[in-house]
């Protein structure tokens, strides 16, 4: 089984394998091109980010400083807005719903590495999808970890580290993040 097939199946794979590295190199090149586009040319920015993403809805707005591992695994809905320096390590799929706003310096991770040093020395990794619902606001410097599902109408406070699923209609904060209160 190829390393990309292992990755797609959610199995441990060699993250330094040539086929995996080629995906990352493609994404790195496209992200570099996107990040060099003049901010006064939003049409060029939109065209380049559309080339990077797997799928996207209407009214897409992504600020410079965007980085990803693959790009094709990122799927965003309508009215998506991200501020500066969004990093999405999309080894596994990342699905983001409609009307989502992401603050500056947010990190979304789908990749995990072994706890045992022997597995890390063997360059092993494993992907776990991330799903973000509709009408979500993610505050600046928040971190979303592998395998997390965030419900609809959720506000994630700045600096939160989300390590487990979050239900609909909640305000989430802290390290690790927890539900602070219900939203109406």
Predicted regions and their residues:
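Terminal amphipathic alpha-helical/low-complexity segments used for targeting or macromolecular assembly
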Residues: 1-59, 177-180
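Flexible, glycine/small-residue-enriched loop-and-beta-strand segment within the central core
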Residues: 39, 66-76, 81-149, 175-176, ...
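Short-chain dehydrogenase/reductase
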Residues: 137, 155, 171-173
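C-terminal/domain-terminus segments
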Residues: 153-165
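Acidic, glycine-centered active-site loop in nucleotide-sugar glycosyltransferases
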Residues: 166-168, 173-176
């Amino acid at each position: 089984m190829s390393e990309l097939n292992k990755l797609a199946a959610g199995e441990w794979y060699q993250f330094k394998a040539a086929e995996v590295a080629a995906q990352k190199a493609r994404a790195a090149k496209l992200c570099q091109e996107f990040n060099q586009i003049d901010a006064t040319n939003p049409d060029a920015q939109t065209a380049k980010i559309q080339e990077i993403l797997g799928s996207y809805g209407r009214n897409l707005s992504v600020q410079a400083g965007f980085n990803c591992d693959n790009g094709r695994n990122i799927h965003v809905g309508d009215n998506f807005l991200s501020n500066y320096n969004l990093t999405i390590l999309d080894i596994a799929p990342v699905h983001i719903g409609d009307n989502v706003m992401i603050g500056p310096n947010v990190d979304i991770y789908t990749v995990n590495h072994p706890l045992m040093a022997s597995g890390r020395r063997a360059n092993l990794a494993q992907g776990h999808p991330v799903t973000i619902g509709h009408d979500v606001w993610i505050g600046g410097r928040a971190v979303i970890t592998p395998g997390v599902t965030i419900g609809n109408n959720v506000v994630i406070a700045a600096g939160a580290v989300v390590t487990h699923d979050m239900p609909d209609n909640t305000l989430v904060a802290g390290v690790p993040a927890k539900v602070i209160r219900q939203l109406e």
